[in-house]
Amino acid sequence: MDQNIFVIGQGGREHAIAWKLSKSNKVDNVYVCPGNGGTSLEENIINVDINIEDKDSLINFAKNNNIIMTIVGPEGPLVDGIVNSFIENGLKIFGPTKEYAILEGSKVFSKEFMEKFDIPTSSFRMFSDNIEAKNYIKNKKYPIVVKADGLAAGKGVIISNDEDEAINAIDKLLDSNHSEYIVIEDFLIGQELSAIYICNFKGASYEIGLPWTKDYKSRDEFNSGPNTGGMGAVSHPLGYQHKNLLFKLHLEIEKILIKTIAAINNYNKKTNKNYLGFLYIGLMINNDNDIKVLEYNCRLGDPETQNLMLTLENQNIDLYDLIVNDPINSIKDFNLLKIDTEESSYC
C-alpha cells in the first residue's frame, strides 16, 4: 500500500514542506491542496483542487488516497478546527487543535496567556471601544504598535509613529469591523528572531528545536512600508556573534520555551487535548540582549520554512521521521539528535 502525505496550503511554505517530504524514501506521493505552480512541476508532488475550507471534502480525500499523515501549513484552517475534524474521523494530522491555535488566532488571548504565565512580552492594553483606545494613546510614548485581535495574514499589525497614525490604525482595525478587539502595545527595538519547534506536549513529550530564522515583513527597502506576511528570510540571523553571547541567548530562549511548555501543559488539563505540531515563538532581542516574546504562531513561518527545509536537507535529516513517525522511537539515539543551528541560508 502506498504511503502518501497530504499537505494543506498553497504558498512557498507548503511547497518547501512537500519538497522535503518528497525526498524521503518512506513516502510515495505528496498531495498538496491546492498547491501552486511550483508544486505542479515537482516529481512525486501532486496538486489537489479542493477548497481548503471544505473540511468534508478534505477528509474524504484523505480517507480515499492512502494518506498516512496530513500536515497543515496555514493558520486559518488550524483556527477553524481542521485538526479536530480529522481526529474525530480517525485520521492522523500534524497540527494543534483549535483549542491551542487560538494562541495565534487571538492576540488578546495570546497576550493574556503570556501575562498569566509570566512570559516576558511588551506592555499592552486591549480595547473594544474606539473612544477609549484613542484616549489611551494621547499620553503614550511613540512609536506604538496597534494590532488586530484576529488573523490578518501578517497585515493586522500597524506601527504608529505619532498620534495621528495611531488614530488611523485604530480606525482601520477597529471601526472597519476588521477586528472586534485591538491590542495596543509598546514598540520594541532590537533584532527579531523566530524560534520554531516540533512539539508533542503530552505523554511522551518532546520538542525539537529548528534553526533560528528571521523574516523581513516590511514591503519596501530599508524596513519601510506596510507589513506583509514576509518578503524574505535568513537562517542563523545573529551572524557569528561571540560564542559567550550566543550561549547566553540560547539559555534565555530556553527559559522562555520552558515557561511556554509549562503554560501549555497547564492548559492541557483544561482542554484534555494534545499539542502536536509546530510552535513558532517570535522574539525580540534588544541592545542589552534582553528577550521578549512578540507572538506565538502554531505553524511554520512563511517564508522561513524555505530556509528550514533546505537546512534539514543539507544535514540529511528526514522530515518524515520528525513529524510522521514518533521521533523518540523512530530516530536512533533520539536524545543525541542535533540539528546544526549555525548553517546559514536565505530566501
What does each of the following model-derived ranges do?
Residues M1-K98:
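ATP-binding N-terminal substructure of ATP-dependent carboxylate-amine bond-forming enzymes
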Residues V7, V32-C33, I71-V72, I93-P96, ...:
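General beta-strand structural signal in soluble alpha/beta enzymes
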Residues L41-E43, I102-V108, D220-E221:
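Short, charged, surface-exposed secondary-structure boundary motifs
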Residues N47-E53, R125-D129, S160:
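Short acidic-hydrophobic, aromatic-tinged amphipathic segments that line or gate anion-handling sites
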Residues F94-G156:
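A conserved helix-loop-beta module that forms one wall/lid of the active-site cleft
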Residues G156-P303:
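Internal nucleotide-binding/catalytic subdomain
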Residues D290-L322:
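Active-site loop ensemble at the mouth of alpha/beta enzyme cores that anchors a bound cofactor
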Residues N325-C347:
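A glycine-rich beta-turn/hairpin centered on an aromatic-Pro dipeptide
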